[in-house]
UniProtKB/Swiss-Prot annotation:
It is an enzyme of class 1 (oxidoreductase). The keyword Oxidoreductase applies. Belongs to the NAD(P)-dependent epimerase/dehydratase family. Dihydroflavonol-4-reductase subfamily. This is Putative dihydroflavonol 4-reductase. It catalyses: a (2R,3S,4S)-leucoanthocyanidin + NADP(+) = a (2R,3R)-dihydroflavonol + NADPH + H(+). GO terms for molecular function: dihydrokaempferol 4-reductase activity; oxidoreductase activity, acting on the CH-OH group of donors, NAD or NADP as acceptor. It comes from Synechocystis sp. (strain ATCC 27184 / PCC 6803 / Kazusa). NADP(+) binds at Y150. The keyword Metal-binding does not apply. The lineage of its organism: Bacteria, Bacillati, Cyanobacteriota, Cyanophyceae, Synechococcales.
Amino acid sequence: MEVNHWIAMADCFFVTGGTGFVGANLVRHLLEQGYQVRALVRASSRPDNLQNLPIDWVVGDLNDGDLHQQMQGCQGLFHVAAHYSLWQKDREALYRSNVLGTRNILACAQKAGIERTVYTSSVAAIGVKGDGQRADESYQSPVEKLIGAYKQSKYWAEQEALTAAQQGQDIVIVNPSTPIGPWDIKPTPTGEIILRFLRRQMPAYVNTGLNLIDVRDVAAGHLLAWQRGKTALTRGDRYILGHENISLQGILAHLSTITGLPAPKNTVPLWLPLTFAWVEEKVLAPLGRSPSVPMDGVKMSAQEMYYDASKAVQELGLPQSSIKQALADAVHWFQNHGYVKTQ
């Protein structure tokens, strides 16, 4: 493992997943609050999201057994990293990174004497109630009903965090909903929706429902969880980091207002993208190529993924910034970073 030199100081946080969407915003928030950041990055990662930031780098993998050595001197851990894929072919990679990686990171944190860990789970691990009902932290869909290997891996990873906490580690679990805003470099599926809208590649859509939150509020929520959150000891000891429940139609209407571009008016029945996804996966799987429309993603769109974040607002002081402004900031970030041609 390769390690660069870091400055020993108090209030140092070890962050995994710092090159990702949530992680990059979290790193910036921690720096703004005056904390030292030590970030774990994979050798294959492109740390474009963290360029020119005054942080210390540790090059390694979530499953490296000697990470405790690199955590020495840090007060806290934010375990944000996760492998994200909606393609069933990646099931083993999802389990290895999300579940076994979480188990190893937490074991290393304990060995390093980390005082408190915030584990970034997801509302994906909670599941949905359906029929437009909002799920809160006390709700749990049976794991077999969670759609796809990614959601199931996040469920089992959260169980790793809960087990470690029950065995004595101080761990706070947060479950972000659907973040939007700047630094969506990959981009996320929601970022892809924004880009398809901007590129005029969305003649029609399958209407669904999401819980959106400004990604910078998610970042702030992580630090607030470290400062004020309750240690996870029983199921439900977690914090949904979310804000506004909104239909995809509503999101597209906001984007139309922000950009002046017309929103698509036509919806398509679910069977159409399901058929396309099924055919695409059957053709591409033998070739080792990822489908453009994963079957699990289409199945998820059949559900309104609505959540109640009032617990995090009341107990942590989770900010609730304007969703329309977060969408506008995402649009401007994509435009300013070459993702879409500006007129």
